[in-house]
Amino acid sequence: MSTDSLFHRDLYAGQMAEQLLNPGPLDESTRSGVFLSGIRRVGKTTFLRQDLIPALESRGALVIYVDLWADPAKSPSALVHEAVRQTLLQLQTPGSALLKRLRGLRLGAAGLSLDIELDRLGEPGGSTLAQAFEALVAKTKTNVVLIIDEVQQTLGTDEGQALLHALKAARDAVNAKPGT
């Protein structure tokens, strides 16, 4: 489908982005996560990728997107850890497109330096998602939004449940810090 035939929902995406990044007193629960649901084939993924992500990024958020249907041979946990790892590697790579987009953060020409072990992210004895997100938010001092498309793929397996617990721990670790 060409992007010309899409029905963009820019206003809705902008309102949602604003509510997520700057929640009012009645919106504080959005800091715990938001689920977008609906019947199949109505444009949820298109909305996320074409409207919401650009709206979040235009407001300075660092967005990590992962589609759990992207590679059915990989577990949801592996896909999420890979997406986080790849984003962090891009931020550590001098001259990367992501680093350039975030140039207003004064991360330096050499890239972002994180004190975590990326090659073992999510593995036993390696860095956790909580450690990765804490370090990322502390270094960038910007909103980080993790979008997991087809999150229902995590349900029904022990590994999927463990991933959801790890994501909750990461959310709690970041949200517990003052000013985040």
Write out the residue ranges for each language-model feature.
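Walker A/P-loop-proximal flanking segment of P-loop NTPase domains
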Residues: 1-40, 46-55
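Short, structured helix-loop boundary elements
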Residues: 10-13, 77, 126, 164
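Generic hydrophobic alpha-helical segments
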Residues: 12-23, 129-136, 167
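Generic solvent-exposed, charged/amphipathic alpha-helical segments
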Residues: 17, 81-85, 168
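P-loop NTPase nucleotide-binding core
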Residues: 32-160
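Sensor-1/coupling segment of RecA-like P-loop NTPase cores
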Residues: 153-154, 158-180
